[in-house]
Amino acid sequence: MKDSIKAKLQSLIERHEEVSALLSEAGIISDQNKFRDLSKEYSHLEPIVKAFKEYTQALEDKQAAYEMLNEKDAELVEMAKEELKLANEAIEKLESELQILLLPRDPNDDANVFLEIRAGTGGDEASIFSGDLFKMYSKYAEQRGWKIEVISASEGEHGGYKEIISRIYGDGVYSQLKFESGAHRVQRVPATESQGRIHTSACTVAVMPEADEVEGIDINPADIKVDTFRASGAGGQHVNKTDSAIRITHIPTGVVVECQDQRSQHKNRAAAMLMLKSKLLQAEIDKQQKEQSDTRKSLVGSGDRSERIRTYNYPQGRVTDHRINLTLYKLDEVMEGSLDSIIQPLVLEHQADLLATMSDE
């Protein structure tokens, strides 16, 4: 391991001890924001400190085993050889683990997200598939203990959605869903198809980290136009009786957001403003990613919504992620929310991309 990496790890251990002490101070405990931020930092540092301590112990074990090789007792020498082998394996494993842990963190990884699914080419079938994708993500969220709430929805004429926007909140939501942005293509025989022909339809998915106050996304009230309108769709007796739905237009960028799912105009406005901030934050992220891709090609992290990222082929029971050439013949499981078999390879590919970038620098 390079001396520069060891020095960085040593400074992180010192910071871990410092944060641990701060978390027990009365002034920090009484300040919810500071306590929350320091708790997050502590939980991020904890696995790094644990792995480095194990790495240091493995180095000591290796040194002790080397010294035992000089023993005259043949049995002790054999034992030393075995311990040396185990220590070398542990060192190699922990060095790789520490490399991953030291990769630059995406500051939005812990964020909640807005998930936007829109029907693209394919008419009614695209709307139906939007509904299928929403169910898939809802089941995945449930499996991970996340919560999901619908912000606004425009239903398709024969089921599904022309567009549905939801908020997903829980631990590490953005870190797992950020690679889902892009065009999702489906190949199957629609229920309305009498000739049994396979149709190709598409939906676009956008995953945006929820922007809270710490992101520094400030919106000038003079830059927005707010309209009220009557909510439509499912929602019980309350729907259509009041102009509770909100549409906000951000004049400088032309970004438009709507919220009609909450039961009061005040709540809809608050949700719409949060969504607008998140869209503006995502625009900044997209801009940064484009600048990075001008200098290096990232297979996974481009987030381009027009890029076809995945195909769901029903006749073959196949899912293919085109960015990493991953093909799985477990479509039914994936549509039931078993997304880790796709998401984890994407995360690993992204980590490999970051490692390659670090080695180039």
From Swiss-Prot:
Chief site of localization: cytoplasm
UniProt KW Disulfide bond keyword: no
Keywords from the named record: Cytoplasm, Methylation, Protein biosynthesis
Entry's Gene Ontology molecular function annotations: translation release factor activity, codon specific
GO CC entries: cytoplasm
Pfam family, any one: PCRF
Signal peptide: none
Region (Disordered): 287-313
Modified residues (N5-methylglutamine): 237
Function: Peptide chain release factor 1 directs the termination of translation in response to the peptide chain termination codons UAG and UAA.
Protein name: Peptide chain release factor 1
Organism for this UniProt entry: Francisella tularensis subsp. novicida (strain U112)
